[in-house]
Structures are given as structure tokens and as C-alpha cells.
Amino acid sequence: MTNYKVLNGNAIKFIAIVAMTIDHVAWAIFPGYPHKWLPIAMHIIGRITMPTMCFFVAEGFFHTRDVNKYTMRMFLFAIISHFAFEIEWYGFRGWHEFIPYYYNYDGSQTSVIWTLAWGLVMLRVAYSEKIKSCWAKTLLICLICVVSFPGDWSCVASLLVLSFGTYRGCLWKQTLWLVFYVGVFGYTFLPYEPLYATLQLSVVLSIPILMLYNGQRGSNPKFNAFMKWFFYLYYPLHLALIGVLKTYHLLPIYR
């Protein structure tokens, strides 16, 4: 019975975009880890986005007509988004801020698009017919984890793209890997921020939404083409806008 599958890809991505924007606004106006209900609620809503993005990167791998162009497009927007990500988090302090690890050694040195792009590469490795050895594939995937580590959500997002692709069509297995990887990720926060470590598991809120996916991008080809580029462009543009508003003190800050 599939009557409940009422959402196409465009609709789910739009939900993810709204959730992401709410989350990023929360980081901007409620800096740090405040234990207040409003920023916590906003961050819980925002946890919907990452698994949804991983899911659709994996779906894109199976639907794209040219995986090489798809991969290049992902890395191009990873580069563009890196600058927007730094501006959003730190404002504009000079060109040095765009160099990873120049100012600090925090885990998130670039945007989640970097980790998603490497997740796509993981899928390509896993499904490659040119790489015959399972050991070689495992080694390459481990190396990709290291390369993707500096991105937002670390290598967790990359591994989730791989898991969503590997277990495509089996939502319960995808959910298990989601809980496992994010649980490990949240555990790293546990010693100094238990509330926000636990909050990461709100990613499971994405599962009921993904259950409604009908397997289609949308019904209007022209609108689909527009939305494809809208999703790519919105991410860096909204980050840059938040960063500019922060830099010029045009956003209220609640501490």
C-alpha cells in the first residue's frame, strides 16, 4: 500500500530548506549552546535537514544521467559554499578566515556540502566495477572519511550518503545506520554539552517525512529544472546573507 507516499522530492527538499534556515538563524541569534526552549526547539527542527540531504544525494546517484557532471557540480558548490559558511559562522574578518584551521581547530571547518560531495564519491567507490577488491574499496572509503572529516557533520554525513545508497529502498536499515552514526557523533559532545549531544538524535524526525517520498522529483519538468538550481544556490546564498547581517549587527543577539 503506497497511498501514504504523497510527497515528491521537491516538496521534501523544500521542507528541509525551511528546517535548515530555522536552524541556522538559531545559531546566529542564539550563539553558543543556550539551554532555553526556543533555540532548542529551532535546533531540533533543523536536525531534519542533514539526513534529508544525504538521502537525496544518494537518490541523485541512481537517477543522474551523468555521474561525473553530478560529482563536479557537488564539488563546485562545496567550494562556493565554503566561503559562505565561513562568513555565516565568523563574519568577515579577512581572507585568512577562509583557510581551514587558521583561526581554530574546531571540527567544522567547511560546509556540509563538502561532506555530502565526498559521500557521493563513497557511493561511486562502493558501486565501482573497476575496483574489484573489497579491501581496496574499504581502504578508499576510510581515506575519504579522513578527507571529509573537516566538513560540517564530519564524515558522518558522507557515511550516511553511503548507507542511504547501499540500503536504498530499505528504510528501517537506513534508520538504523542514521541512529548509529549520529549517536557516535553526538557522543563526542557528551562530556561538555550533554543536552546538545542528545539533541542530535532528533535527526530521526526526518524518517516520517522520508516515508512519504513517492520516488518522483515533481510533475512539472520546467519547475523541476528551476528547483534543481534553486536548491544548489539557496544554501550558499542564505549562509552569506546571515553572515552579512551578523557582521553589520543587523540581527538581534540573545545570550
Placement of each model-derived feature along the sequence:
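Alpha-helical transmembrane segments and their immediate juxtamembrane cytosolic regions
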Residues: 1-255
